[in-house]
Amino acid sequence: MAGAKEIRSKIASVQNTQKITKAMEMVAASKMRKSQERMAASRPYAETIRNVIGHLALGNLEYKHPYLEERGVKRVGYLVVSTDRGLCGGLNINLFKKLLADMKSWSDKGVETDLALIGSKAASFFGSVGGNIVAQVTGMGDNPSVSELIGPVKVMLQAYDEGRLDKLYIVSNKFINTMSQEPLIVQVLPLPPSDDSELKKKAWDYLYEPDPKSLLDTLLRRYVESQVYQGVVENLASEQAARMVAMKAATDNGGSLIKELQLVYNKARQASITQELTEIVGGASAV
């Protein structure tokens, strides 16, 4: 059995770690609330533009934009949204596992894949396991802006415009609630028609100013940018929630470990006292 002094040192070490994890839990809780506010603020715009674009996909368009047309699939692209920091449980690895499975399903069909990575964890992971990385951005912090995402989005849209990509997906975590985050792979190009059954019963006709091509070119790019940004802010809220839960679990585990060490310390202390008493009694008997 370890000595009492050594056990006291272990208890102190765990208590110090527990203070750190508790502080990180509180910081994550505060950041999560702010992330939820940003997510809630941007979600109506993202959903509205998605609905408008869904109407366009179902409508009788004067000009058929390339982003609305299905074509033979030889290469697909993924915009992968991850975190810049760790200590958030299995948030990133669960997302990467889902993505790898999807990439394998395309690979089995002879389709190649390109990756545009957002977040240092994705860059580190795919730098290790391999993958055709065509763009990446890291270090966006806790308050990302659309302008910071333009680089990877532009690279993927240019590849799609030039026919080097035939499908484009966003890979990110959707914030369900504090205890639940869902990894999602969502197709953004070509634009999938709305799955709303009510919309499919209606015919949508639009008048365009100044003309369909210039308006759709701008609108569809804004649509892609808005979906990527929404994916980033949802992923950020998911990150803070996962980190808060992970740090709470670590704090609770630290408390359990301290109790166990305290019992071991008490037993060691009791054994030490018993030994001292035995030595005293033995010494007195010898005299």
From Swiss-Prot:
F-type ATPases have 2 components, CF(1) - the catalytic core - and CF(0) - the membrane proton channel. CF(1) has five subunits: alpha(3), beta(3), gamma(1), delta(1), epsilon(1). CF(0) has three main subunits: a, b and c. Transmembrane segments: none annotated. PROSITE patterns: ATPASE_GAMMA. It is found in: Cell inner membrane. Its main location: membrane. This is ATP synthase gamma chain. Produces ATP from ADP in the presence of a proton gradient across the membrane. The gamma chain is believed to be important in regulating ATPase activity and the flow of protons through the CF(0) complex. It is a peripheral membrane protein. GO terms for cellular component: plasma membrane; proton-transporting ATP synthase complex. PANTHER family: ATP SYNTHASE GAMMA CHAIN, ATP SYNTHASE SUBUNIT GAMMA, MITOCHONDRIAL. Keywords: ATP synthesis, Cell inner membrane, Cell membrane, CF(1), Hydrogen ion transport, Ion transport, Membrane, Transport. It comes from the Bacteria. HAMAP family: ATP_synth_gamma_bact. GO terms for biological process: proton motive force-driven plasma membrane ATP synthesis. InterPro entries: ATP_synth_F1_ATPase_gsu, ATP_synth_F1_gsu, ATP_synth_F1_gsu_CS. Belongs to the ATPase gamma chain family. It holds the Pfam family ATP-synt. CDD domains: F1-ATPase_gamma. GO terms for molecular function: ATP binding; proton-transporting ATP synthase activity, rotational mechanism.
